[in-house]
């Protein structure tokens, strides 16, 4: 089967990753030790996408857990699903990266990277037909951002034809951990533009907003945020894990979603978002879910798609729904919001359907959109980057690890290029696109 190797790096990556594994273990009927006690054949049918089968009906996640300090790893190991993972797959250093991208990418991380690649290689060799890799990390820290991008580029070298999907937590202005986040994020985006095939952008600020506004939680914990992220990750990967009428895998998703190779940063959303106590009081219908899904308040990245246009988007339905209902509703939404979709990509909305709903819900809807509005997110980080870099603030932490100022300048201009590429396609109309082709066409000679 089409296996995926999962990597989680840094504190954020490991916590999101742990929530993800907890979530999908439940969906596949595994208990906290990985022993199968589910009821449905469908849970077993494609178990091998994410799990290796060990002896005694036990399943082990195909996950590699990486960090430069032991703290988070110990927390994962001591957590409810700590016994699930293979002990050899925990790879950690002792020193920590101290939120310094250069430490993760060039010094501390570079020392550990070969150990990690050995584990990745071992997992990949055990696969029947490896589909690709997915990595969870944050872009604001040292290990997830610096070492995470180092791993991505090393894996890219070794497996150039496999898919690379990343779930990247982008630093947000209101919820900031450290002052150097803009540096780390810009340097990471510089790497992701070149080396990742699809990047799902998740934003702490948007997650907090969802928790406060929609879920009515007065002070959300990171556990609540991770719970939201794991719902989206589970949704995006549904089609791979369960049989359905319209299955898409990572590659199909990329083919349908990425019109130009550099523009592979997606916004994700999930519906129904109801607080944990409220969902037993109301039924959800396909129209309601579709409405919710296109609501900016449901997006997990803090940029409003109404300020941009969708190049492409993909909707993944889960539950017992008729394909016709879904198609009708999607058409309905498209007709109402046609101004938010570019006209020069016809049929730019793809729908996939899986008949198995997530735990505790009748049906759910995961949304992945490639919108030009994501440039707001990069602009925001870029402005903060420029403000600090102009004064060369905090730069000695990076140059001390052997980085050059030139690298910062390159990363900055690459990110600015990305923003202007998004802007260019946002403004492009059908006529302009056609004119470009007409200019290229050879003139017919008069006879």
Swiss-Prot record:
It comes from the Eukaryota. Gene3D superfamilies: Helix hairpin bin, Tubulin/FtsZ, C-terminal domain, Tubulin/FtsZ, GTPase domain. One of its GO terms (cellular component) is microtubule. It comes from Colletotrichum graminicola. It holds the Pfam family Tubulin_C. Residues 429-447 have a biased composition (Acidic residues). The keyword GTP-binding applies. Dimer of alpha and beta chains. A typical microtubule is a hollow water-filled tube with an outer diameter of 25 nm and an inner diameter of 15 nM. Alpha-beta heterodimers associate head-to-tail to form protofilaments running lengthwise along the microtubule wall with the beta-tubulin subunit facing the microtubule plus end conferring a structural polarity. Microtubules usually have 13 protofilaments but different protofilament numbers can be found in some organisms and specialized cells. The keyword Transferase does not apply. Mg(2+) binds at residue 69. Keywords: Cytoplasm, Cytoskeleton, GTP-binding, Magnesium, Metal-binding, Microtubule, Nucleotide-binding. This is Tubulin beta-2 chain. GTP binds at residues 11, 69, 138, 142-144, 204, 226. Belongs to the tubulin family. GO terms for molecular function: GTP binding; GTPase activity; metal ion binding; structural constituent of cytoskeleton. SMART domains: Tubulin, Tubulin_C. InterPro entries: Beta-tubulin_BS, Beta_tubulin, Tub_FtsZ_C, Tubulin, Tubulin/FtsZ-like_C, Tubulin/FtsZ_2-layer-sand-dom, Tubulin/FtsZ_GTPase_sf, Tubulin_C. Its cofactor is Mg(2+). Tubulin is the major constituent of microtubules, a cylinder consisting of laterally associated linear protofilaments composed of alpha- and beta-tubulin heterodimers. Microtubules grow by the addition of GTP-tubulin dimers to the microtubule end, where a stabilizing cap forms. Below the cap, tubulin dimers are in GDP-bound state, owing to GTPase activity of alpha-tubulin. Transmembrane segments: none annotated. CDD domains: beta_tubulin (cd02187). GO terms for biological process: microtubule-based process. Residues 426-447 are annotated as: Disordered. It is found in: Cytoplasm, Cytoskeleton.
